[in-house]
């Protein structure tokens, strides 16, 4: 199991820590809608070792961001793997399939569940050996509600 910490999540629009009550707000998930999208930004090959680094981005899909009144919820990180070599799209496909399997068991999704699902994905992938540069991003709607 890979040990890493997920930093506190700040609302980037006003640089304020997202409150516990706001983090726990969740909406019901539909079975046929992909909840979290994975995108592999680039592969990093270690010169001195037989391992591959993967710069990856996770994003909550638009439908659930809209329902949660979140403009953006995502996370970028660097995953170091025990893979000798791999293609960008094969790693992305593998991560997306595993993440979809995790998200299927969710009844609801919110900020806390997003973080929980990403952590579970990292821990389920035995070929991920370390995690670096975890950079969450969150931007909440700021409109006066009547």
From Swiss-Prot:
Q: Source organism's superkingdom? A: Viruses
User: Which organism's genome codes for this protein?
Assistant: Subterranean clover stunt virus (strain F) (SCSV)
Family of the protein in this entry: Belongs to the nanovirus U1 protein family.
Q: Name the chain's protein.
A: Protein U1
């Amino acid at each position: 199991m890979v040990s890493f910490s997920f930093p506190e999540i700040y609302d980037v629009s006003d640089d304020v820590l997202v409150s516990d009550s706001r983090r726990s707000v969740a909406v019901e998930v539909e079975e046929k809608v992909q909840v979290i999208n994975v995108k592999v930004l680039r592969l990093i090959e270690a010169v001195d070792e037989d391992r591959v680094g993967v710069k990856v981005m996770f994003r909550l899909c638009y439908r659930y961001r809209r329902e949660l009144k979140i403009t953006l919820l995502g996370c970028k990180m660097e995953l170091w793997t025990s893979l000798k070599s791999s293609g960008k799209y094969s790693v992305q496909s593998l991560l997306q399939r595993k993440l979809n399997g995790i998200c299927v068991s969710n009844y609801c999704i919110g900020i806390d569940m997003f973080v929980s699902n990403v952590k579970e994905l990292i821990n389920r992938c035995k070929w991920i050996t370390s995690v670096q540069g975890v950079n969450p991003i969150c931007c909440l709607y700021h409109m006066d509600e009547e």
